[in-house]
Amino acid sequence: YTSSSDLHNTLATTQSAIATGNIAIDCILTAKLDYAEKHGIKTEYSIMAPENFPLDSVELSSILGNIWNNSIEAGERLIISDPTEHPYIYFYIKPYQNMILIHIENNYDGVIKGSIDGDILSVKQGKEHGLGIRRVKELVEKADGVLQITSDNKIFSVHIMIPDKENNKLL
C-alpha cells in the first residue's frame, strides 16, 4: 500500500472484516483474505490472539504481510502453471504453552530458490528476491522466537513461535 487511503479503499471493498481486537491482525488479514478470495485462492484461518501480542503492531504487520504475500504469490503462480490445481492457504494464530504460534501453509508449483546455507530465498527475480523472508527471520529472532520453514510434496509451510512473556489472556 502506498498510502493509508489505499488500505482504507481495500478494506471498504472487503466482504467481511476480521475483528480480533488486534488492529495489525485485523487489517492485514482482512485485506489478504479478500485479495486471495478475489484471485481464486481458497483460505481457511483460525485466530486465537493474546490480548497483548508480544510484537508491536509494525513488527507483527511486517511478519503477517510478508508471509501472506508469499503464500498469495505462490497461489497465483500455481494457477498460471497448472490451471487444474486449486490453490489454498491455511493460516492460524494460537497459543501453545508459553508461546504464540503463527502458521501459514499453502500449496505451490514446486519451484523454490535457496541460498548456499540452506535458507529458502524466493522464486522472484532481481535484487529484492528473498527480502521479505529475511525480514521475517530478523523480527522473529529479535523476539527470541523460532522460524521454521518447510517444503514437502509441493506444500510450503512457515511456522513461527514467539514467546508470550506476559502469558496473557486471549482476546
Residue locations for each model-derived region?
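Conserved polar catalytic motif of the HATPase_c/GHKL fold
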Residues: 65-74
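ATP-lid-like helix-loop hinge signature
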Residues: 73-95
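Short beta-to-alpha transition helix within the HATPase_c
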Residues: 5, 9, 21-39
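Glycine-rich nucleotide-binding loop
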Residues: 110, 152-159
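Conserved short strand/loop->alpha-helix "switch" segment adjacent to the catalytic nucleotide/phosphoryl-transfer site
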Residues: 17, 43-64
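Glycine-rich/acidic phosphate-handling loop/turn and adjacent ATP-lid/helix
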Residues: 98-130, 169-171
